[in-house]
């Protein structure tokens, strides 16, 4: 089991660098965004981004998730896997471009042609970047991803400062800077990972069929996941206005801190889950990883809730400061999302994408219904609560369905108690209505309940330092 921990720890270290550096740079940009963009402009940019994320699974057949799974499978030629993904992306981009052209001829009020151009560019660079990063993981080129992620963030930071602060191009400058960063990253992956070697003229039809059979059910899963994470922006815009939607979008920046921790571990874990899957979990590797992941997420979540208002005072300026009120439930939703994804990686390992889709769709339905009801009464805060409930349902359902493939050795009573403690902490934030040291009780309580996991993490970290 030592080698399993070593391999996972190495990847966690690499993904930490590729995730934390860009996130730090992105936080530098938040004051620039909130000073140079209006809430309405930020709302428009957010809607463009979320619309791209909605269309991606349909026009790419969500092939990106098949890329890593099949690149790690020795039964398939890596060149076939890469070429299949590339062809599907190019066909999808052609269709999106055609749709954008049709939209421009309809002269829809408020829909500028410049937005459509950026929309197509955002779609193409996102689709290509997603598949390239997944393929690099599959061929064990994680180090290339690290540098690529940092390079993308540095370009975005520099371009945003130039376009927003110096040239004062507003929303156009923001969109141009983000697109430029993504394009540079794509070129980097191609050059450093020598991906051109994996492009072939002839592709096995069996590879195409197997990849599409694997990824097709995920279209519904990813779409439902999008509903969980992004539909609230549209409903909020419709029911409360674009300015409130922009405020809500900014609120996601603080939960983004927790999302980095989730993303780092998940990126590394998704590789290990496929390589090390054992239905009996004889050495307890998967159970140990689950417990440590769960501890890390709930502990960091609790700490960020404590520091929510001080962080908001630093990051949010002017009218954006009110966004701090929506942060706590969004933080808890990140925890549920993280654990649902952890379990989802096991379903990916056994190639059961149908179960992933069913759980996510049910969660999305509940989320949507709650959005309409809660936003009506509580506006943006209602949207945050609905998101938390949606992810919570997916998490619980996947836990139940997982028993079909593996038996994890967990302390259910402890996990349930800690989740309830997070909810109590969330409620207490609004009762106190200001920063209070009483909030420190909650992270300390979590540490006490997860002492075993704290010791294991310390031992692993100590071993890494010695090496």
Residue map of PLM features:
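N-terminal membrane topogenesis motif
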Residues: 1-25, 76-79, 83, 143, ...
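Specific pore-lining/lateral-gate transmembrane helices of multi-pass inner-membrane transport
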Residues: 70-88, 247-360
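Interhelical loop/hinge segments that connect adjacent transmembrane helices in multipass membrane
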Residues: 1-4, 8, 117, 143, ...
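Membrane-water interface segments that mark the loop-to-transmembrane alpha-helix transition
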Residues: 10-22, 47-48, 57-104, 114, ...
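Signature of the first transmembrane helix
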Residues: 5-64, 97, 101, 152-157, ...
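Hydrophobic alpha-helical transmembrane segments
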Residues: 117, 146-195, 362-366, 380-401
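Membrane-proximal transmembrane or re-entrant/amphipathic helices at the cytosolic face
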Residues: 2, 408, 427-467
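Transmembrane helical elements of multi-pass membrane transporters/channels
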Residues: 11-26, 152, 174-189, 193, ...
